[in-house]
Every structure is written in C-alpha cells, then in structure tokens.
Amino acid sequence: MKKILLILLICLTTIVNGAPNPFIEVNSMDKAFKMTGFTLETPATCKNYKKKKINVIKDKMVEVVYLKETNTEGLVIRKSKGTYKISKDVKTIRIGNYDVIEQTKGENIILTTWTDGTYSYVVNPNGTELNAEEMAKLILSIK
C-alpha cells in the first residue's frame, strides 16, 4: 500500500526546473503603473523594431522589449527603483542631464545605465548595433 501511495504521489508531483520567471507581461503602460507605481516612456519604434512588449516585476521594474519580426527579443529598456551597476570595462559620459555609464565593444555600445535620482535606467541593445549618437538620441527619449 505504501508503495502505491508513493507512486501516486510521484506521478502527481509537478517538477519545476529553474527559478520561476518574475516578469509579468502586461498590455499597457497603465497596467504597468498599477503594478509598480511608475511608468516607462520609450519610443514607439527603435531601429528596425516595429513591435514591443511590456513586462513588469511587481513593485520593482518596468521593462520594454522591442521585438524582431520573428517575435524574438531585441533591444531591452528597463526602469527600476534604486541603482544598477555595470561591473566591467565602462566609461562615464554626459548625455543631457545624466551621467551615463556605458560598456562598449568596438564602436558599438553594448550596455548603458543612468539614474535620474529616483529611478535607474538600463538599455541593453541585445545585439542591436547602436553607435554613440544613436544611443544618446535613444536615452534622451526615455523617461
């Protein structure tokens, strides 16, 4: 009897691999605001990306992901409370009123972060080639 119960228990158990995904996809910035208390203003399109999706970590972060034509993730912009630190090969430049920390690879910027005093922002081009001028224009359009 014990063996049968053990087999039933094993069959009914759900196996979870890895950590749960903390992101919740929402369909509007209004819903993101309700879940975090803040919004993230980004351009409607960026480079060759025509679509985007909004992800939220409740009370912590809003993320806008620009999607490739294949609906795979491309450029990512995040806004959260607190600060974000890049740990290697960085330089700080001034863009508008922000001291922007950027990590580069050749002529392209592969990660940037800055703060407005309350929120921190991150742009991860995720393989999208952005030069300094394109990144500066993008940063100045984010609020």
Predicted regions mapped to residue ranges:
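Polybasic, low-complexity association/targeting segments
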Residues: 3-4, 21
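Sec-dependent N-terminal signal peptides
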Residues: 4-13
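Bacterial Sec-dependent signal peptides at the C-terminal "C-region" and cleavage site
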Residues: 12-22
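Short, solvent-exposed recognition patches
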Residues: 20-110, 115-116
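Short, exposed beta-strand-loop hairpins at the edges of beta-sheets
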Residues: 113-116, 120-131
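Surface-exposed amphipathic alpha-helical segments
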Residues: 125-143
